[in-house]
Amino acid sequence: MPAGDSHTTGCYYNVSAPSAATKKYLALYAEAEAHYVVSCIPNAVHYDSCLCIPAFDENAELLTRLALFAKSHLKCLFILVINQPARITAASKANLALVATIEKKLVKQQSHHNLNLYALNDANDLLVVDRYTQGNQIPSLQGVGQARKIAADIALR
């Protein structure tokens, strides 16, 4: 999948049941969103894989690229962590436009805390993590690494 700019990179995971070590890690070190996702995605839903995407100042065209990529993947959870450093007080216009496009084009299935689950197509879902609005922003020195960790922790669930 072509990257929109240098702020977006993806990590692709095959999903399986968490091991005892993974469960211990999640209990001790996981980000809050990894615990919230249990209330956002129904237990009956199973994904074969997931794609973790941190996004800051991405063009709304990202949704189109994700939808095209999703056509070749079945039962995939796309985890989009829309983030912004805390030193920037107002939400980025690009982040707001991306979220507005998602809300306009996709059907929201579930919502819990700063997580919103959307149907991307018949076989795949998009989980949007809000780490860009006031109070949810990522500490400035942690940046994209923190966004990746949030997505990876969710993927491990």
What residues fall within each predicted segment?
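Active-site-proximal specificity loops/subdomain of glycosyltransferases
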Residues: 29, 91-157
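Short beta-strand/loop segment that forms part of the nucleotide-sugar
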Residues: 75-86, 126-133
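Surface-exposed, flexible loop/turn segments at secondary-structure boundaries
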Residues: 57-59, 86, 134-136
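N-proximal low-complexity "stem/linker" segments adjacent to membrane-targeting elements
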Residues: 2-77
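Extended aliphatic helical segments
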Residues: 15, 37-41, 45, 81, ...
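Short acidic, gly/pro-rich beta-turn/loop elements at beta-sheet edges
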Residues: 61-63, 88-90, 138
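Generic alpha-helical propensity signal that fires on short helical segments
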Residues: 44, 69-71, 90, 94-98
